[in-house]
Amino acid sequence: MNAKKRKGSAVERNIVSRLRDKGFAVVRAPASGSKRKDPIPDIIALKNGVIILIEMKSRKDIEGKIYVRREQAEGIIEFARKSGGSLFLGVKKPGVLKFIPFEKLRRTETGNYVADSEIEGLDLEDLVRLVEAKISRTLDNFL
């Protein structure tokens, strides 16, 4: 495994560990570079029936754009549809880790997806709060 893949794997393992510490059931399922034919997101996390799916991408420069190839994006979007999960692009840049809802990504003319540096994302704590807000129950849920 080259240094770039090792660094990306380390970031994914760190996210998995942090989500697990927050009470999620988490699976790391990296498929890039494998012979796998069915695209799946890098991280699948579940908590009380709420599913979040994270496709991780990283860049060395803070201002660079992050691209997801059309074929890969279509596959993980279909996975999200089938699972009922919320799909996020996890973006790791120097000093930055954010999670962008996939629907906020821009499409290029060739159908690829791109995250510009201006797109707002959630930090890990905000992502956890988003999930916890979905699972919080009020008395109305039981009436």
UniProtKB/Swiss-Prot annotation:
Domain of life: Archaea
InterPro entries assigned: Hjc (IPR002732), Hjc_arc (IPR014428), Restrct_endonuc-II-like (IPR011335), tRNA_endonuc-like_dom_sf (IPR011856)
Effect of D42N: No cleavage of 4-way junction DNA. Binds junction DNA normally
Record field: catalytic activity: Endonucleolytic cleavage at a junction such as a reciprocal single-stranded crossover between two homologous DNA duplexes (Holliday junction)
GO molecular function, one term: magnesium ion binding
Function, in words: A structure-specific endonuclease that resolves Holliday junction (HJ) intermediates during genetic recombination; may have some degree of sequence preference in a mobile junction. Cleaves 4-way DNA junctions introducing paired nicks in opposing strands, leaving a 5'-terminal phosphate and a 3'-terminal hydroxyl group that are subsequently ligated to produce recombinant products. Can cleave all 4 strands 3 bases 3' of the junction center. Cleaves both mobile and immobile junctions. Modifies the structure of the 4-way DNA junction, a model Holliday junction structure.
Family annotation (HAMAP family): HJ_Resolv_Hjc
Further comment found in the protein's record: A second Holliday junction resolving enzyme, Hje, with different substrate specificity exists in this organism.
Protein name in UniProt: Crossover junction endodeoxyribonuclease Hjc
Organism whose genome encodes this protein: Saccharolobus solfataricus (strain ATCC 35092 / DSM 1617 / JCM 11322 / P2)
Gene: hjc
